[in-house]
């Protein structure tokens, strides 16, 4: 830039700082094209900020293809001035899929692992949820638009259980499902830091994490209203449309 403009590197850097420009950085974005985007945002955020009485709100999803990875060298432990260190190379030992349902009110999670993530496994997880939640409560399920959540078998399962109410997130809007935030914590605190020499070791580690965190669970707090979210999306769309692209 300095060579192209005839300015010094110091001058270019000063201009970039003055206008908060960071040309070395890039980010990706994806906007939902769901025609019911506004209605779905209001519906789901309403469940977060004002959960219905005598009902459970469960954020449900699956974290698929979790790899059981063994490091090629022992993990070097944390030391003063030095973080825990892992070898870059690893050995794969298969994968598992975690199905999880986050209770919005308590922060506790119902979870189980399966080798695959088809509709059959999802229906079995719904059976697990049904056995775990009190019979006198209605259950509101927040789900994404993954095809396994909408098969005929799943629709029949739901039709036979009128206490269940399904709320689908808008397309391309996984950020609206709070269980995704829990998946981030699981990944950072357990999966990435662990050494798993088999899928059984990985599954045992996930189950242990579930048991320990459920003992001291606290709910995630949703802070933005639907109006604030929609206004933010509208501003972003306006900036994007005026960017000249």
What are these regions (language model features)?
Residues 70, 201-245:
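C-terminal domain-tail junction helix/linker
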Residues 137-149, 172:
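Acidic/histidine-rich, metal-coordinating catalytic segments
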Residues 85-90, 158-178, 194-196:
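RNase H-like polynucleotidyl transferase catalytic core
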């Amino acid at each position: 830039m300095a060579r192209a403009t005839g300015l010094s590197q110091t001058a270019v850097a000063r201009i970039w700082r003055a206008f908060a420009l960071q040309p070395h950085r890039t980010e990706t974005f994806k906007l939902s094209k769901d025609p019911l985007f506004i209605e779905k945002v209001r519906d789901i955020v309403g469940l977060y900020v004002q959960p219905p009485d005598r009902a459970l709100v469960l954020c449900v999803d699956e974290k698929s293809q979790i790899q059981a990875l063994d490091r090629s060298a022992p993990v070097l432990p944390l030391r003063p001035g030095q973080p825990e260190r892992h070898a870059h190379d690893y050995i794969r030992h298969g994968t598992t899929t975690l199905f999880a349902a986050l209770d919005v009110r308590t922060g506790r999670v119902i979870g189980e692992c399966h080798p695959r993530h088809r509709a059959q496994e999802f229906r079995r997880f719904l059976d697990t949820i049904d056995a775990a939640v009190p019979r006198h409560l209605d259950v509101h399920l927040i789900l994404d638009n993954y095809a396994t959540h909408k098969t005929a078998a799943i629709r029949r399962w739901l039709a036979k259980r009128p206490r269940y109410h399904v709320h689908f997130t808008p397309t391309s809007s996984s950020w609206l499902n709070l269980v995704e935030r829990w998946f981030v914590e699981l990944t950072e605190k357990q999966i990435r830091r662990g050494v798993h020499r088999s899928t059984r070791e990985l599954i045992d580690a996930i189950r242990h994490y579930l048991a320990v965190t459920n003992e001291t669970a606290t709910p995630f707090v949703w802070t933005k209203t639907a109006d604030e979210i929609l206004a933010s999306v509208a501003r972003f769309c306006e900036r994007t449309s005026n960017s000249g692209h």
